[in-house]
């Protein structure tokens, strides 16, 4: 039984019902409907922390989905799972792939920045300030782009850019 048919959560059930109605009403192909079902099931599994199941659903959705914009969100969610699992290099690959298909995805830019910032912090702990500055500069570049796309979001990043004197080149 597909995950979407066994949701216990009221919000998930409501989303599933609305999505099913839209899929019936909108002119979409069978393949597009199937891709969306896998994507929806992936989101549901991901929300419950069932990452292996979520990845299986996302990979199946990727196999079926042809629209670049829709694929960008699938790739972004795969990146989120790898980030949650501490697999930052793999997460970056998926965030970059998502941005190739949809350059207007500020949340992917933000997550890339967070990973570079984290790596910068690790470099400081290792006593390598030169590398940390390079990583922080890279994080700043991605945060500036995310802020440009979504100016009211990422307040903590904006504050960090100000505190570290990296805001001047921003916005």
Swiss-Prot record:
Matches recorded under Gene3D superfamilies: Tetratricopeptide repeat domain
TPR repeats: 35-68, 72-105, 120-153
Pfam families to which the protein is assigned, alphabetical: TPR_1
Subcellular location as annotated: Plastid, Chloroplast thylakoid membrane
PROSITE patterns assigned to the protein according to its UniProt record, in alphabetical order: TPR, TPR_REGION
Membrane topology annotation: Peripheral membrane protein
Cellular component GO terms held in the UniProt record: chloroplast thylakoid membrane
UniProt GO BP: photosynthesis
UniProt keyword terms in alphabetical order: Chloroplast, Membrane, Photosynthesis, Plastid, Repeat, Thylakoid, TPR repeat
Top-level taxon of the source organism: Eukaryota
SUPFAM superfamilies according to UniProt: TPR-like
Family to which the UniProt record says this protein belongs: Belongs to the Ycf3 family.
Function: Essential for the assembly of the photosystem I (PSI) complex. May act as a chaperone-like factor to guide the assembly of the PSI subunits.
Protein name: Photosystem I assembly protein Ycf3
Organism: Nephroselmis olivacea (Green alga)
């Amino acid at each position: 039984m597909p995950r979407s048919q066994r949701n216990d959560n009221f919000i998930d059930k409501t989303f599933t019902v609305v999505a099913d109605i839209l899929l019936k009403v909108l002119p979409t192909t069978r393949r597009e409907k199937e891709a969306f079902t896998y994507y929806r099931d992936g989101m549901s599994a991901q929300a419950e922390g069932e990452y292996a199941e979520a990845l299986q659903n996302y990979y199946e959705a990727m196999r079926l989905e042809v629209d670049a914009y829709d694929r960008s969100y699938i790739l972004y969610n795969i990146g989120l799972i790898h980030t949650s699992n501490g697999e930052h290099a793999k997460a970056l690959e998926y965030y970059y792939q998502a941005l190739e298909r949809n350059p207007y995805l500020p949340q992917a830019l933000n997550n890339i920045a967070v990973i570079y910032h984290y790596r910068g912090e690790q470099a400081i702990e290792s006593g390598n300030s030169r590398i940390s500055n390079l990583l922080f500069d890279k994080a700043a570049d991605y945060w500036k782009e995310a802020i440009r796309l979504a100016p009211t979001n990422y307040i903590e990043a904006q504050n960090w850019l100000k505190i570290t004197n990296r805001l001047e080149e921003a916005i």
